[in-house]
């Protein structure tokens, strides 16, 4: 059984009612993991994600474990979809970028607004999968997104997909589950602790994340 690798994903929503949209893209057919499936931008947590960015703000609201996952989610969203979640920065104080994602924020005069992220929940890939991930999902407000979504080598058909009156049929169970949770958080109707979505004995299970999260 492969050990799941830490990963992170960002659910970006904008609009209301029938104009509600989510940022998503389709994984290429030639990849090993979830080919042809629509997903939110995201990917594995890399070692550099443990280090604070020069251009981040509000990180204390997350705690160390969620902070590095949040960095990974925002970095992957930039790499896969070409957009940044943040807010305009104040006067520059000679900050230096160590990584491409920091440079992207600096060039656009933005701050990575970690305090605008809401923790949605965690999902673990089934044990029979050849590639397994322990993924933490975050919710972000699409009104604070800078840039135009664009397809990359990692995601195709990247755009704001309408979900106000229909669901993307290509979404997997876990994606639909986390989207429903994100919508509940956005609408103020979510209850309980952040959920843990996993599989046991070939059945879908939903537990509670017992990390550093707090009740909503």
PLM segments and residue spans:
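N-terminal leader/linker segments that precede catalytic domains of diphosphate-processing enzymes
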Residues: 1-216
């Amino acid at each position: 059984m492969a050990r799941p690798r830490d990963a992170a994903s960002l659910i970006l929503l904008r609009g209301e009612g029938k104009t509600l949209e989510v940022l998503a893209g389709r994984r290429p057919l030639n990849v090993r993991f979830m080919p042809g499936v629509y997903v939110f931008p995201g990917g594995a947590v890399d070692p550099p994600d443990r280090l604070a960015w020069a251009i981040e703000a509000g990180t204390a609201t997350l705690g160390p474990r969620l902070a590095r996952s949040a960095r990974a989610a925002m970095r992957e969203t930039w790499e896969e979809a070409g957009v940044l979640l943040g807010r305009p920065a104040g006067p520059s104080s000679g900050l230096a970028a160590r990584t491409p994602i920091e440079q992207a924020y600096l060039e656009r005069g933005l701050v990575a607004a970690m305090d605008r992220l809401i923790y949605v929940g965690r999902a673990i890939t089934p044990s029979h999968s050849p590639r397994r991930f322990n993924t933490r999902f975050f919710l972000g407000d699409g009104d604070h997104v800078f840039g135009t979504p664009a397809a990359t080598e990692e995601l195709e058909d990247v755009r704001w997909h309408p979900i106000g009156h229909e669901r993307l049929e290509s979404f997997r169970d876990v994606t639909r589950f986390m989207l429903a949770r994100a919508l509940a958080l956005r609408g103020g109707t979510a209850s309980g602790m952040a959920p843990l979505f996993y599989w046991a004995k070939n059945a879908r299970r939903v537990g509670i994340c017992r990390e550093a999260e707090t009740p909503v």
